[in-house]
Amino acid sequence: MICELCPRRCGAERRGDGVGNGYCGAPEMPVIARAALHYGEEPCISSENGSGTVFFSGCSLSCVFCQNYEISHNMRGKAVSVKRLAEIFKELYEAGADNINLVNPTHYVSAIAEAFEIYKPPIPVVYNSGGYDSKEVLNKVSFADVFLLDLKYLDRKRALKYSNAEDYPSIATEAILECASRVGGNVFDDRGLMKKGLIIRHLIMPQGTNEALGVIDWVKKNVPWAVLSLMSQYTPCGDLSKFPEIDRRITRREYGKVLDYAAESGIENIYTQKLSSFGEEFIPPFDLTGV
C-alpha cells in the first residue's frame, strides 16, 4: 500500500502487519491498543452503558504533549486483520456499547471501511480524530454517523511548533466544515445521546488562551449549532524539555477567561470540565484489552 491518505502525503509503502515506514509509523493493517467500553467521553457519547471505544496506534500528527504518547508515538498495540476488526465491533455491540467510537482512525480508514462492510452494528459510529483529515480520507468515511474532531490550533506557528503541522489550521477547519455539511445538524435520542452530529473539541493549553478565544469565534461564525467541548484536562506528557512553556497545567485564571468568553458567545451547546480533570486517570490503560 503506497499511502497518501493524510495531508502529509508521504508516499510510504505500508505493508501487512509490520511497522510502517511512513510518518505515522503504521503498517497497512490496523494496530489497536485497546477496545473496550469507555466512560470518559462527552456526556452525549459516553453514558452509563459506555462507548465502545477502539484506540488505534500511530498518528499522522506528532503532538509533543500527547497524553496518549505511548500509542501515538511509540506504536504500542497489536495489528489485527480486517475480519478481526469487524469481530471487535460486534463484541463491543454485544457488550452493550451505545456506539462504536473510533479514536484516531485517520490512517486506517481503508481497513475500517472494509471491516464495516463485513459487520456494522445498529448503533451510531463515532469518527473521533485529531482533525488532521484530508478530503481523500473523509471521502472514505461513509460509515460515520457522528464526527468528533479536534480543533487544536488556528495559529500556524503553534501548529508547527507543537505538532509539526503548519497547515493544520486550514486542514482541520476544512475537515470540520465538510463534516458539518454531511450531518447537517445534531440529532439526539431520548437519553441525550448523539445519534448524528458534530462535536468540536479544543484542548486549552498553557499560554493558549487567545487561541481558545479564536476557536470560540470560529465556531460561532461557521458552525454555531455544533457541540463545542472546551477541555481543561491538559496533562503534560512525553519529553517537554524543549518546550518548558507548556510543561505545566493550565491555571484557573486561564480556564476561567475561556469559560467567561464562551458564556458570552451565544453558542448553545458547550461542554466544559472541572479544572481538576487531569492526570493519569484520564488516560486508559493501553493493555490490549479486547484486541
Positions of the model-derived regions?
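Alpha-helix-loop-beta-strand connector modules within alpha/beta enzyme cores
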Residues: 114-124, 174-179, 252-258
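Short low-complexity, flexible loop/linker segments enriched in glycine and/or proline
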Residues: 116-117, 141-142, 163-166, 284-289
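Conserved glycine-rich "GG(E/T)P / GGGxP" loop and the immediately following alpha-helix
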Residues: 93-118, 160-161, 167-168, 174-177, ...
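Hydrophobic faces of well-ordered beta-strands that scaffold small-molecule active sites
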Residues: 52, 100, 125-127, 147-149, ...
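Conserved radical SAM core fold
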Residues: 72, 109, 132-134, 151-169, ...
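Auxiliary Fe-S-binding modules of radical SAM enzymes
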Residues: 1-19, 185-291
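Conserved Radical SAM active-site core
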Residues: 20, 24-147, 155-157
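Aromatic-anchored, glycine/proline-accented short structural segments
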Residues: 134-192
